[in-house]
């Protein structure tokens, strides 16, 4: 039944989500797009906290989680773990002069973890960045001066290995292949003396096809402080890496359908970027690290805190450079936890439900018009038990804000809804009959 459910979920949900833009944030205009949260709905519902690892949930942030202790009462075995998730986001965009509403639906992750002895293997796919915006600048007569549009993003596929060094200490490494494309276009509008748009307008289009490799190293440690309390800690490190960007630029004369906004190319000229050295460029992906610690009672409750940082100040993108934009080091502080009323209850569905909550504060590393772009979010979630008791359907909710209206910028007030299936089972165990 679980296998059939997985197939239906992938076919219906993931395909539909890929047809949508992964973000509708105007801040995805900068760099290589808005950085996507790399983590499960379980993590996201605890303010992004990812240090907690166990034998029945996939952890996308720390590859050491692939090698965990056995489940008590399962005859010394660890299950295969599968997880797939997605989200819907709605945002109110506010400036000093206007407001607008946007929404987006996105596939967030597909992951599988397989234990073999003291080793554990993991592989899957997650979005890394996402671009999706449509912006307009106006003149004093409220006529459109420029229209900016962007789409695309960078995805990650990964293959990881974890090793259980001792009963509570594990180490792991992920190898990532990063790939994707980003397309940005700018239309410059011209008007006649009466303020009527001319028949022909000018458009510049830039496209980048990106690819590269990266690593993520993780360490996880758990130990019992006494008969009830358990200490949990973890750390990760992602070394600096490069993305190769193969670029194209074109200048077009277009006409516009005033009703639908559809663009029709009249004339198109491909720019020779090799002259300026922009035909193929290398983007430096900054190093990143995280560490955290928490305490709790196994299968009952947990609370923890985590800090992550990234040397975003090392990032640059020659093709999309802007004099008003700089990059500074990014960081995130997450605090959260979970509570389970009665994990082994024979009756009472909500007694076995996992209740999660958390809060996070993030410095995105983006500085526009001398204004740092920061983000704040409060999250809640539940894990609803399924079938064998170690699988669950997870629902998450987050409300928060990004950016500011200072210095002619935009503030986003957003609401995010997340859903996932977290499935665990011993697929290769032989059945016994009496």
Per-segment meaning from a language model:
Residues 1-25, 434:
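Bacterial Sec-dependent N-terminal signal peptides
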Residues 21-434:
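Subset of outer-membrane beta-barrel
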């Amino acid at each position: 039944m679980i296998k059939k459910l997985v197939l239906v979920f992938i076919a219906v949900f993931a395909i539909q989500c890929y047809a949508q833009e992964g973000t509708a944030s105007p801040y995805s205009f900068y760099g290589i797009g808005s950085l996507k949260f790399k983590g499960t709905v379980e993590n996201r519902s605890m303010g992004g906290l990812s240090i907690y690892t166990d034998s029945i949930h996939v952890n996308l942030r720390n590859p050491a989680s692939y090698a965990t202790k056995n489940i008590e009462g399962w005859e010394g075995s660890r299950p295969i773990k599968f997880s797939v998730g997605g989200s819907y986001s709605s945002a109110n965009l506010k400036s000093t002069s206007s407001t607008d509403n946007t929404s987006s639906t996105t596939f967030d992750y597909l992951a599988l973890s397989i234990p073999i002895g003291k080793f554990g293997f993991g592989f899957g796919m997650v979005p890394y960045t996402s671009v999706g915006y449509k912006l307009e600048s106006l003149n004093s007569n409220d006529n459109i001066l420029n229209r900016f549009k962007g789409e695309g993003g960078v995805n990650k596929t990964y293959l990881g290995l974890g090793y259980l060094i001792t009963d509570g200490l594990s180490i792991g490494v992920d190898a990532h292949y990063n790939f994707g494309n980003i397309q940005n276009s700018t239309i410059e509008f011209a008007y006649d003396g009466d303020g009527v748009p001319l028949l022909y307008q000018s458009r510049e289009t830039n496209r980048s096809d990106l690819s590269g490799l990266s690593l993520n190293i993780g360490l996880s440690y758990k130990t019992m402080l006494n008969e009830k309390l358990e200490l949990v800690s973890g750390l990760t490190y992602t070394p600096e890496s490069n993305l190769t960007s193969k670029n194209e630029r074109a200048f077009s004369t277009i006409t516009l359908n005033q009703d639908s906004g559809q663009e029709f190319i009249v004339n198109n000229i491909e720019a020779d970027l090799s002259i300026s050295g922009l035909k193929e460029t290398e983007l430096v992906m900054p190093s990143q690290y995280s560490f955290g610690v928490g305490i709790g009672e196994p299968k009952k409750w947990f609370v923890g805190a985590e800090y992550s940082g990234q040397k975003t100040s090392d990032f640059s993108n020659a093709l999309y450079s802007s004099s008003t934009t700089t990059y500074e080091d990014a960081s995130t502080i997450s605090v959260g936890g979970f509570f389970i009323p009665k994990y082994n209850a024979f009756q009472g569905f909500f007694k076995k439900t996992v209740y999660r909550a958390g809060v996070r504060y993030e410095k995105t590393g983006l500085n526009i018009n001398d204004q740092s772009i920061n983000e704040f979010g409060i999250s809640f979630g539940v894990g609803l038990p399924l079938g064998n008791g170690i699988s669950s359907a997870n629902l998450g909710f987050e409300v928060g804000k990004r950016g500011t209206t200072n210095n002619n910028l935009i503030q986003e007030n957003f609401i995010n809804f997340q859903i996932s299936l977290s499935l665990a089972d011993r697929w290769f165990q032989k059945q016994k009959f009496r």
